[in-house]
Curated annotation (Swiss-Prot):
Ranges of residues in domain tr-type G: 5-240
Tagged with keyword GTP-binding: yes
G4: region residues: 153-156
Region (G5): 192-194
Name of the featured protein: Elongation factor 1-alpha
Region (G2), start-end ranges: 70-74
Segments for region (G1): 14-21
Lineage: Eukaryota, Fungi, Fungi incertae sedis, Mucoromycota, Mucoromycotina
Gene coding for it: TEF-1
Places the protein is found: Cytoplasm
Amino acid sequence: MGKEKTHVNVVVIGHVDSGKSTTTGHLIYKCGGIDKRTIEKFEKEAAELGKGSFKYAWVLDKLKAERERGITIDIALWKFETPKYHVTVIDAPGHRDFIKNMITGTSQADCGILIIAAGTGEFEAGISKDGQTREHALLAFTLGVRQLIVAINKMDSTKWSEQRFNEIIKEVSGFIKKIGFNPKSVPFVPISGWHGDNMLEESTNMPWYKGWNKETKAGAKSGKTLLDAIDAIDPPQRPSDKPLRLPLQDVYKIGGIGTVPVGRVETGVIKAGMVVTFAPANVTTEVKSVEMHHEQLVEGLPGDNVGFNVKNVSVKDIRRGNVCSDSKNDPAKEAGSFTAQVIVLNHPGQIGAGYAPVLDCHTAHIACKFAELLEKIDRRSGKKLEDAPKFVKSGDSAIVKMIPSKPMCVEAYTDYPPLGRFAVRDMRQTVAVGVIKAVEKVDKAGKVTKAAAKAGEK
């Protein structure tokens, strides 16, 4: 068996017709968690419906339809393996809610796979000024995705043309460079997601193709196929090295034990004996024990849903939406105000200063006022369009100063990603999403329990 493989999350980006469903379907199908029985069932259905030619995309459509109907699909279906990694596809291609999912999604993508259709006209449509591709790639970059793989798909439709491949590399390099990626660190792979060329095995149809290479801080790497390129992703730095952030989902009072906050560790580590601070409640106390699934844990790591017992704190002191942190290592604080880049998705009117919708950020659900619209920016290029706009409407992106109506704890996205992205809810729908750029933190004296004071003296 050997060592457990490292997990990486990829997000697949590309125009609706770039063939990303087929390509993703192919990888999941060939290297993934779909068992033989399910595949045979899907293939039979596809053939009966005369969709034989779409079998990979069809597999994906089936999965997607089931997911959207709320049938919980075995999440293994969205996974595949490379020699080095367990890969999870965190946003399935072609999703209407791509932007919302990317920003409010639970996981952070480690790498983007940009799928470009090589066919004449198709490539141009995908990358045109209003192109979705551009926007999704910029969004991935804004959300901290720094590794990218470009798969140039449907090479069969260009008769496997080297000239077309090089032409596209040139265009795409310029395009991703504008966003902020370094083309030298990006593998460009010519593929056919449908026929399987250069997906897992080297293609015999493109003898001119000598392979891809990339240079990153981790050194130079080269390979032939898309699978090679995914296997060559630089291993992500995991958030266990960061200071602790654990947003509370609930706080229970358990007879004979006391107060037990519950939540998911987003960054850092929590263990018994630690002195923790809850923000914005501003209460500091000692952790007596940590458990998961009713078993004692030595430590809770990022991704773990834990319950932990705290001394001398009543259920009234802390609540859902509070954030637990290490009192000695960048403790969490209340946010007096913060600036964020907000993308308006669907709002029927105009949004101006004074608008005060509810923000969902980690487990907090609190109204925040749009105090000032600082600038309007171009969603596709990230460039400033105007200073201090009066209003923003659907489709606009703006830098906004926001003030919470009640004490709230949030962080800059670059410091603690899960606490730095939010959804704006109004009229029972998500009207906008945002990424926090900077937070003005409030310093004030808080309550330190006897247990914490004692533990601090040790």
